[in-house]
Design a protein with these regions (language model features):
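Acyl-donor (CoA/ACP) binding surface of acyl/acetyltransferases
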Residues: 1-91
Length: 91
């Protein structure tokens, strides 16, 4: 869980980073699911992921985790795609 300020709005981001040799094994999806569940358990009402628009694998992880693509925005000088989920909601 990483606190972020996106378009002047405080958000909490689900983040993960895996070494290349672990890609394609479902580990990022498993980590994202666990992070999502834990975030909601401790009381966060909304979680996001900020993803490079060219990172198709991470976008798939976000979708598998139930996050919806909301928008593209500029974050720290780079274009990112914002995926989000609210507690007890789906796309």
């Amino acid at each position: 869980m990483i606190p972020q300020l996106v378009d002047q709005v405080p958000e909490v981001e689900i983040g993960y980073l895996l070494a290349k040799e672990y890609w394609g094994q479902g580990l990022a999806t498993e980590a994202a699911h666990a992070s999502r569940d834990y975030g909601f358990k401790i009381g966060y009402g909304r979680l996001i992921s900020l993803i490079d628009p060219g990172n198709i694998a991470s976008q798939k992880v976000a979708l598998k985790t139930g996050l919806c693509c909301e928008k593209d925005t500029i974050y720290v000088g780079k274009t990112v795609r914002v995926y989000a989920i609210a507690a007890n909601e789906s796309c």
